[in-house]
Amino acid sequence: PQKHTVFRVKCPKHIPEMPLTGDLTTGVYWRPEGKEYLAGSPKSVFDADDLEPAWEDFEELVWPALAQRIPAMEELKLTGGWAGYYDCNRLDNNAVVGKHPKFENVYLATGFTGRGLMQAPGIGRALTELITTGSYQSIDISNMAVERVLGKKARPEPYVL
């Protein structure tokens, strides 16, 4: 599993209609959560033994990026944070979906790093087609196959929010 830290911050000037936003130059992301904001960065570590938030990332990465993009965030206050695990593979941070090449009747849909809920309808449909017809019919997701991981053919996902 990959450990990610999420920070909760309060800003004097609340902007309630701001959508989930990501700064692709730094990887820092943020979104409103009630009267506060949640923010984080793509910096992560593969450490299954430590769930303590990476507080230093707030000062070094998150706050500077927020203040640069949204000047009002210069005055924000850190109100909390937590760390949790993302399900992913070490090769490229992308999901693994499809029939297992070595085991009959085993199908995989794993490693979505928090994107599973958004991708579930399409993945469900694709797997249903694969199981019932032997191939993908409406959307070809063969590039997510387990052979990609076994053959170490990475399709890197640089921004895991």
Which residue stretches match the model-derived regions?
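C-terminal catalytic lobe of FAD-dependent flavoproteins
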Residues: 67-161
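Predominantly flavin-linked oxidoreductase catalytic cores and closely associated redox partners
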Residues: 1-5
